[in-house]
Amino acid sequence: MDIKKYENFHLEEIINLYQSVGWTNYLERTNILEEAYANSLCVLGAYDSDRLVGIIRAVGDGRTIVFVQDIIVLPEYQRKGIGTKLLKAVMEKYKDVYQMELLTDNTEKTKAFYRSVGFTASDDMGCVAFIRM
């Protein structure tokens, strides 16, 4: 499994990843999705030979904050350490950044995953997160 910079946006493979995990909100306006990828701070892909099987996308200023916007692994490749490798690669790249944040589903599975790589839920720190959609 190779983790490397995702440089050439291919709409079909990105759509495949998002659909495989049931993320459809972005797929209604693919032109915006393509712009979002182009304007991201960092996008890394996980490759099985030449096949894109996972992706992580980070946004932010790269100095004081990095926000992990997307992390997706094809279902048949999940539970094999790929998500961990993707996340750790971004964490290493931005190890000197003051804070790294993400927003995820409120399930024990996702909370356990992010805690296992060193993240803390904001409410455990006496904080609250707000979102406007």
Task: List each model region and its residues.
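Residue-level recognition of the GNAT/N-acetyltransferase active site
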Residues: 6, 74, 105
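Conserved GNAT acetyl-CoA-binding A-motif
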Residues: 93-105
